Amino acid sequence: MWAPRCRRFWSRWEQVAALLLLLLLLGVPPRSLALPPIRYSHAGICPNDMNPNLWVDAQSTCRRECETDQECETYEKCCPNVCGTKSCVAARYMDVKGKKGPVGMPKEATCDHFMCLQQGSECDIWDGQPVCKCKDRCEKEPSFTCASDGLTYYNRCYMDAEACSKGITLAVVTCRYHFTWPNTSPPPPETTMHPTTASPETPELDMAAPALLNNPVHQSVTMGETVSFLCDVVGRPRPEITWEKQLEDRENVVMRPNHVRGNVVVTNIAQLVIYNAQLQDAGIYTCTARNVAGVLRADFPLSVVRGHQAAATSESSPNGTAFPAAECLKPPDSEDCGEEQTRWHFDAQANNCLTFTFGHCHRNLNHFETYEACMLACMSGPLAACSLPALQGPCKAYAPRWAYNSQTGQCQSFVYGGCEGNGNNFESREACEESCPFPRGNQRCRACKPRQKLVTSFCRSDFVILGRVSELTEEPDSGRALVTVDEVLKDEKMGLKFLGQEPLEVTLLHVDWACPCPNVTVSEMPLIIMGEVDGGMAMLRPDSFVGASSARRVRKLREVMHKKTCDVLKEFLGLH
């Protein structure tokens, strides 16, 4: 009895084993022995844990906030973002010796059956892991598309990319307004009371110069905090955005999207973020937006104060007394008398407050902790309207307007949304040209700007002296200045060391005496003067460097001479 049963038992087992072997050879695991499905379960690490140059930028615009990984999708992690909080972002993986990433990472992952729900996103393999990312390339063929956010995009792909970058959903809508914008000169076409409609596929090239949606505002933060500026611009085609900080005596460093420099980051939507702000981070941060139709520059002031100074900086003058107006006209006190700090001073020529290096000599009162305190003390009138950027505003009652562009020196058309604009907003080109550029004093003059900054100008110049202008003679289209020389820093062609106590005669070329540049006036204030030599004569052109002398500037120039910086610049930049 036992033997037959045993044979039947082994016979059945052999059948089961054969079936299992057949299924395995065919690549179909039996249901009872199916492998457990791969689960990501928040495996991986945050981008900034893997590489300090990888940041959780504004792709989610800080809206997908979280506190733990469990609040995110299984393939995501809860990571610190640019806003100082945390948001869900696709996890990253890196190979470790002897390991191939965290447990649960598939060996050969593909995008098959991997869905990206965000509009404008697509699947990509990152270190063997499928992740969703925003499209970074769009076709160049125009197919203008009106979207539910009130904007017109170059084509559908650009609309989807914008939706992805902001983590929102955009839909195509019927175009209600259609303006054909000129570059500069001709006035905008008159519109009827009932605007015509146009198909998004209109082949007519529609261009509009960049315009801001929101007015730039000053921000003041305490040391160690995080601050961000968003240059929210519109234009057709979509403007390219760059950021730069206005630096004293140095070339500005231009930063583009996805650019990291120290504690300053420009995200993929061109949002400027400053982490762990320090006193030296204070200053004017300038956003430049440009497309084929025009260029726009907007200044975003940032003040950084110590914690115990935050309350004190709100008062512009003690006991409520008016700040002496004469102090606002004095040059910044850059002499070195102790600890150097970044402060603000009022620049009457620029009609704005700018940063400088304060050396605690206290020779005048034109130094402030914050931009706001400086403006409250010294800004006697409204900010020059013509120097403001074109501002569309958030509303959608679109109308054609004109604004003065200080970069091109011309009035240009832009789309006004109907609310929250600024003073640089005119109903016609004629009205714009009658009002701009903004008159300063009795003249319509712009600030003189040298062709290069301090160091580059020094290397390009034939002579550099420290001196005071004792006499100035005006002639048609030119002039002569007698300069009492205090010190010769550079002299390649004139032999100034043999001059003795005699003043140096400098010829001023191509001078418009209504708005003279360089701004040379008779004064006891010491100047740094850099110019050219032709036939043994010292000459200054309108773009020559002439600026107030300070211990810091002179120290910088001595350092340039000592380190032979000009030799390096001549070799790599071709200076002569």
UniProtKB/Swiss-Prot annotation:
Q: What PROSITE patterns does UniProt report for this protein, alphabetically?
A: BPTI_KUNITZ_1, BPTI_KUNITZ_2, IG_LIKE, KAZAL_2, NTR, WAP
Domain NTR intervals: 445-566
The signal peptide here is 1-34
Q: Which UniProt keywords apply?
A: Disulfide bond, Glycoprotein, Immunoglobulin domain, Metalloenzyme inhibitor, Metalloprotease inhibitor, Protease inhibitor, Repeat, Secreted, Serine protease inhibitor, Signal
Q: Where in the cell is it found?
A: Secreted
Note the Pfam families from the entry: I-set (PF07679), Kunitz_BPTI (PF00014), NTR (PF01759), WAP (PF00095)
A GO molecular-function term, please?
Answer: receptor antagonist activity
Provide the family line.
Belongs to the WFIKKN family.
Q: Which residues are glycosylated?
A: N319, N519
- Disulphide linkage map: C46-C79, C62-C83, C66-C78, C72-C88, C134-C164, C138-C157, C146-C175, C231-C287, C328-C378, C337-C361, C353-C374, C386-C436, C395-C419, C411-C432, C445-C515, C448-C517, C459-C566
Natural source organism? Homo sapiens (Human)
Q: Which GO terms describe its cellular component?
A: extracellular space
Primary location:
secreted
Ranges for domain BPTI/Kunitz inhibitor: 328-378, 386-436
Q: Does the keyword Signal apply?
A: yes
Q: Where is the WAP domain?
A: 39-92
Q: What does this protein do?
A: Protease-inhibitor that contains multiple distinct protease inhibitor domains. Probably has serine protease- and metalloprotease-inhibitor activity. Inhibits the biological activity of mature myostatin, but not activin.
Q: In which tissues is it expressed?
A: Primarily expressed in ovary, testis and brain, but not in liver. In fetal tissues, it is primarily expressed in brain, skeletal muscle, thymus and kidney.
Please state what the protein is called: WAP, Kazal, immunoglobulin, Kunitz and NTR domain-containing protein 2
At the top level, the lineage of the source is Eukaryota
**SMART domains, A to Z:** IG, IGc2, KU, WAP
Residue ranges of domain Ig-like C2-type in the record: 210-303
Ranges where the Kazal-like domain occurs: 126-177
Query: InterPro entries this protein is in?
Result: Elafin-like_sf, Ig-like_dom, Ig-like_dom_sf, Ig-like_fold, Ig_I-set, Ig_sub, Ig_sub2, Kazal_dom
Kindly state the subunit structure of this protein.
Interacts with both mature and propeptide myostatin/MSTN.
> For the site Reactive bond, which positions are given?
K140, E141
GO BP terms in the entry: muscle cell development; negative regulation of transforming growth factor beta receptor signaling pathway; roof of mouth development; skeletal system development; transforming growth factor beta receptor signaling pathway
